[in-house]
Amino acid sequence: ASAKPQAALELLPLEQRIKAGVVCAWFNHRRNKMAVDDPRYSCFLSVDEEHIWIPGWLREFTDSDLVSLICPRPLLIEQGKADAIAWWPQILQEFEDARHHYRELGVIDRLEIDLHEGGHEIRLERSLSFLKQWLMD
C-alpha cells in the first residue's frame, strides 16, 4: 500500500497539472528511515525493501526537499502515530522543514499535517475534505 503515497510524493513535483495532493503513511525523515536502524520504526537496513530504495535519496535529498518542489500547491500529509513505518516525532521534524518553503512564499495554509493516533492507514474523510477544499473552487 505504501507505493501509492510514494508515487504521490514523487509525481507531484514533476506534474504541474496535479493541483493538490495527499500523502498518506509515507512522508518520513527519509535519511533515518533508510540508514538508522531503530526499534521505534522499520529501517531499510533491516528489512527486505530494496524496491523502495532510490539512488541519491540518502545523500542528495529528503522528503521535505520533495515538498519544496510541490510548493505552493496544497499538500496534506497524513500519518498515524502507531505506524511502525516511522517514528512520529521525526515526521514532525521533517514536516517543519517542509513548512519552511510554504512559509517563505506566504502560503502556509496550503500545507497541513494530520498526525492521528492510528496506524498505517488512510483517513478517507480527512483526505477528501482537504481535496474538496482546494479543488472545488
Task: Show the residue positions of the predicted features.
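Short glycine-enriched nucleophile-adjacent loop
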Residues: 5-16, 131
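Mobile cap/lid helix-loop segments that gate and shape the active-site cleft of serine hydrolases
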Residues: 18-66, 72, 84-95, 104-107
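Acidic/polar loop patches that form or flank catalytic/metal-binding clefts of enzymes
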Residues: 20-21, 77, 110-111
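Active-site phosphate/pyrophosphate- and oxyanion-stabilizing loops and adjacent acidic/basic residues
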Residues: 9-10, 64, 96, 129
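Conserved alpha/beta-hydrolase "nucleophile elbow" surrounding the catalytic nucleophile
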Residues: 1-2
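C-terminal catalytic histidine-bearing segment of alpha/beta-hydrolase fold enzymes
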Residues: 96-137
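Short strand-loop junctions, especially beta-strand C-caps/beta-turns
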Residues: 80-82, 116
